[in-house]
Curated annotation (Swiss-Prot):
InterPro entries tied to this protein: Ribosomal_uL22 (IPR001063), Ribosomal_uL22_bac/chlpt-type (IPR005727), Ribosomal_uL22_bac/org-type (IPR047867), Ribosomal_uL22_CS (IPR018260), Ribosomal_uL22_sf (IPR036394)
Annotated CDD domains: Ribosomal_L22
Keywords: Ribonucleoprotein, Ribosomal protein, RNA-binding, rRNA-binding
Name assigned to this protein: Large ribosomal subunit protein uL22
Cystine pairings recorded for this chain: none
Length: 156
């Protein structure tokens, strides 16, 4: 049996956004699980057109968390984000010899859930043990190199 910890969260939705859900998902996958500040920074420099509406929804969810629930904006993390398909507007493009091709103007419903998670301290015991093990390996390799040169010097 697994236990899940419930964190306080806030939601925002943008409906009928004039961007294809497939193209929105390309951008959404970049920011899932990131902090809100990191996600907005990533989207600010993303070249895709879908990054603008996704960034707006994330900013809206962060504002909802701060204003409605009183959560600290520095602890917010994008816990859930997804794009569903909205209605498709159909248009006709006239083609040669009386033909007509259909143009599908797709829309998306973008949903974002942000959670307030406590910040995890970096560089705790794990970082110290990693540095000490690296130092021990370096010391061992230096000793081995000195021993090797010593043995070469003694034989000649």
């Amino acid at each position: 049996m697994t236990t899940t910890t419930e964190f306080p969260s806030a939601t925002a939705k943008a409906r009928f956004v004039r961007v294809s859900p497939t193209k929105a998902r390309r951008v959404i996958d970049l920011v899932r699980g990131k902090s809100v500040n990191d996600a907005i920074d990533i989207l600010r420099w993303a070249p895709q057109a879908a990054s603008e509406p996704v960034a707006k929804v994330i900013a809206s969810a962060a504002a909802n968390a701060q204003n409605n629930d009183g959560l600290d904006p520095s602890t917010l993390v994008v816990s859930e984000i997804f794009a569903d398909e909205g209605p498709t507007a159909k248009r006709i493009r006239p083609r040669a010899q009386g033909r007509a091709f259909r143009i599908r103007k797709r829309t998306s419903h973008i949903t974002v859930v942000v959670e307030s998670r406590p910040k995890q301290e970096k560089g705790g015991k794990a970082g110290a043990s990693k540095a000490s093990s690296r130092a021990a390996r370096a010391q061992g390799s230096k000793a081995a190199a000195a021993k090797k040169t010593e043995s070469k010097g003694g034989t000649s």
